[in-house]
């Protein structure tokens, strides 16, 4: 058991212990892993077979707005919301996914307005869950990402893809840098008690995936 008598030394020791206790995935890098990376037509074929989770950061937002104290997640006036460009972006990504014939299964969203709207515009539905946010409200003071890691490590229903629309910070916390851009998706493959990143798809990449299918 750690015992501390000097406040500054105690704080430093506790910080070190917290780093050691952090999820292993967060100590790495969320770029596609060598030996697992997929792109182009090979990525499309893999996604059509199901078995992956696509973790999206919400699409483009209006940064003149800010998250403030709120009484409930449906209180959109106190949150940063999608911009018109972000709404168009979400619709376009959803259309590309349908055009590629990808088997969309469950759609899970952080309960914030921007993430729920992203899911609904992409897929026509979204089930709110704080698991993909990692904590309640706007403060990460009590963040617990263990359930998010467990979700990402679990396979979706057979033959389907699990779609998540959430935020950049939770993904960085469990997978490491680089940070997801707005509208960017990480493609994750379950790997025992964790997961591996096999691809990252930026909003503008979907057209290239469709083109790779036509050229195969």
PLM regions and their residue ranges:
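N-terminal secretory signal peptides that target proteins for export/translocation
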Residues: 1-6
């Amino acid at each position: 058991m750690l015992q501390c008598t000097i406040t500054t030394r105690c704080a430093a020791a506790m910080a070190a212990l917290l780093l050691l206790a952090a999820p292993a995935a967060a100590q790495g890098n969320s770029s596609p892993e060598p030996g697992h990376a997929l792109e182009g037509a090979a990525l499309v074929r893999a996604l059509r077979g199901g078995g992956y989770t696509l973790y999206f950061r919400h699409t483009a937002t209006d940064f003149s707005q800010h998250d403030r104290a709120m009484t409930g997640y449906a209180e959109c006036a106190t949150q940063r919301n999608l911009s018109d460009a972000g709404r168009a972006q979400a619709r376009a990504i959803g259309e590309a996914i349908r055009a590629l014939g990808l088997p969309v299964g469950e759609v899970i969203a952080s309960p914030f307005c921007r993430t729920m709207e992203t899911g609904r515009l992409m897929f026509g539905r979204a089930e709110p869950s704080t698991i993909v946010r990692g904590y309640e409200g706007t403060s990460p003071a009590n963040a617990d990402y263990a359930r998010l890691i467990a979700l990402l490590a679990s396979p979706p229903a057979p033959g389907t893809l699990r779609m998540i629309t959430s935020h950049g910070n939770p993904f960085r916390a469990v997978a490491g840098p680089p940070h997801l851009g707005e509208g960017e998706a990480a493609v994750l493959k379950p790997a025992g008690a964790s997961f591996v990143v096999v691809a990252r798809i930026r909003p503008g990449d979907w057209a290239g995936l469709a083109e790779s299918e036509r050229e195969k």
